[in-house]
Amino acid sequence: MSNVDISNDGFIGLDYDSRNYLQPQSWPVAVDHQASHRAEGARDISPLQTSGHAFEQSVAQDPNLMVDWQFQHMQPHLQYSHEEASSAPQFTTASYGMPIHSSPIDLISGTPQGPLSGSLLDGPYLPLSAPVDMVPFPYQDLQSDLMAFPSDGLAHGLPEIPSYAAPQNVIDSSSPADTYLEVRSLTSSSSDNGWSTIEPRRSHEYFPDQGFFINPTQTLHDRSLSESSYSTSYGSFVEISNPVNSPSSDTNFDAAFNNTMTRRVSFDHTSHGSQSPTAVSPVAIVRPIPVPMKKPSSPTRSTGSSSSTSPPTRKPSRKSPIAAKTAETKVRKQSQNGKPETEKRVGKRKGPLKPDQRKQASEIRKLRACLRCKFLKKTCDKGEPCAGCQPSHARLWQVPCTRIDIKEIGYFMKDWKADYERHISLGFSVGNIKGFSEHERTLFITHGYGQILPINAREVYVHNDQCFNVDWVETYNRGPTKYEVETAKLSAGMEGISHAMLSDYLDRHIDGNGTFEKFVDDYFEGTPFLTQMLKTAFRFYYRTKMPVIRKALKLIVAYNLTLHITLVEGLGEEDGLLGKVDVEGSKFKGKTLAPVMINFQIKCAMANMWRELQKDVLEELSSLYSSVYSGEKLKNWPTIFILASILLAVWEEMQFDCHYRTRDPAAVEKFCNDMETTPVGVIVGLFQAISQKLPAFTEWETQKHHHLLHSNPDVCSAMTEVRQHVTQYESYLRSRSSSKFNPKDFDCLSNKFVSRLVVRAN
């Protein structure tokens, strides 16, 4: 290399002839320093190759730029210091079109390293900025001196330095060569504006004709990359061949590497005017689209950036995006066509609908299919009734052809207020009330069945005080007898009737020890069959704790207490509250009736309560009936029977109260017809349809038929009780379907609908 004329500024003259230049050889630098904490937590530098650009660039004189490289064997027992990178001036861009960043020499960490061990000798390395005359190896003798190193890597033509016995950690560095290694390990997800390099051929016997020589250390520039590998994590650093290195570039490795690492260093010189395989234009590189794997959330990474044990190698070329999409489409089609052949298909249609069929389907969607076609998954039509519900086709199907869902069959109750509006009079109008007292007192309200409802009451001032009388009718062991008592001028407080307290009041009628059975005995006064059925339903709930059965029991309590008078408990003898019953023959003798306004307010709150409960019960019935035709068959049959029995018992009482309290015969007739035609027919007809495979109630035997109801002991016990009730009142039940209203008989309409449910099931 003595024939190479290097000027004082580190550049080679333009008259340099590469044919007289020796073959470029690589020189090794050993890495054998104890690990220390990184001086810099992140690095974002990488070499920018300028080969292939035929432009001049003038570089300002750098006082810290070495004319001759200085090298020394790095002994493990010596320490050395770094040069401050901030003191280095920046390159200028006199004639080059892009900004040129600082010199790699200036990027060397300036943080001094502490002594590696207390027992090691003191002897720092020569600083990089030392005078030129102190360098023992000038740049001209670099070629010959490096050739003297022993080489055992003859297979690849690169010298190697044997590792030391004791494992050593790698020291941090800010050399651009380390970032250059990561640039070479970038995946296809890198920016299209970056440079990609290709491994040079190992044989350098014949170099292309070169016009002039450029020092590679002066063509390294900073690059700002957004790749995720340029973060504070150094897990992607591995042993890599052919990096551009310098004597102080082996200190930027993480301390996690505890073993000695050998580095191979080589320079690849390329002229500006030659066609070199080491540089590839980024425009010609097309970034492949990774094929989506089973886990699309995890990005595809190259082995060079994701693995810390294997050297970074370029993956073979992937398939084109078109091929990837085609393969993905094929897999999707196979997954769609891979259905089991034994899967049950709903319907028989194999192709698209015809125009007339499409029009018919659109009309049916607007009208909704009838219950039969909905449950049996048949094609419905616009007929009234539809073709499927005709007598010649329905056979055992006795459900009315209706398009109303079960949860909506309570439509007949719209605007029905006969359960509480009887006590509404002009006395409750706003014009009759002058005001309310600010003082409130607590009254303990009851219906006479052992439970108490506390309510805040206040005095009300009215113009006409002749509207506070309460009348009721009793039929206990005799004909109907009417009573009337004047009550106190009190109303509920500012908060009114609490919905939560009222619900808890109803719950205590069910949860108390024997309270529900006592309520049934006292209120229904021995109504045949209905009394026994309600007690059986309560015992079934007590054993199963089914919430829907509880709602049904709460429904019948709430409805009957809505039409019941209210009493006041806990009054002393000195409390002169009006409303005490002194009439002989009344079962309420000696008790005090609640003020009429509070009685009405409780009725309104109770009426809203049982209407909500009935809505919930109808929704449960709708889902239970649907489950029968969805594959569960008779699993929910006992629950359906209990719910239907209680619901029909409430509707029977509603018919009687409508006759008894409504003075308009036409309105009463319409209400009863609306109830019996569709709602009662749907409940009874559907129960008949799902009971075809079960024996009659009078023929039920647990030992013989228990398997039909999944051998449930609670269900079998309830069925045994129902069989006893039906057997006891069979003749009575068969005569109840034709019963008529009688104002003197409160049980005249009892079991009218329940008998249809039981007898038709037989």
Curated annotation (Swiss-Prot):
Keywords, A to Z?
DNA-binding, Metal-binding, Nucleus, Transcription, Transcription regulation, Zinc
UniProt keyword annotation of Zinc present = yes
Effect listed in the UniProt record for changing C401A: Decreases conidia production and increases kojic acid production
Q: Name one GO cellular component term.
A: nucleus
Q: Does the keyword Zinc apply?
A: yes
Q: Which parts of this chain are annotated as the region Disordered?
A: 267-361
Q: What PANTHER family does the database record attribute to this sequence?
A: ZN(II)2CYS6 TRANSCRIPTION FACTOR (EUROFUNG) (PTHR35392:SF1), ZN(II)2CYS6 TRANSCRIPTION FACTOR (EUROFUNG)-RELATED-RELATED (PTHR35392)
Q: What does this protein do?
A: Transcription factor that regulates conidiation as well as kojic acid production, likely by negatively controlling kojR and kojA expression.
Q: What name does this protein carry?
A: Transcription factor kpeA
> What is the native source organism of this protein?
Aspergillus oryzae (strain ATCC 42149 / RIB 40) (Yellow koji mold)
What is the gene name?
kpeA
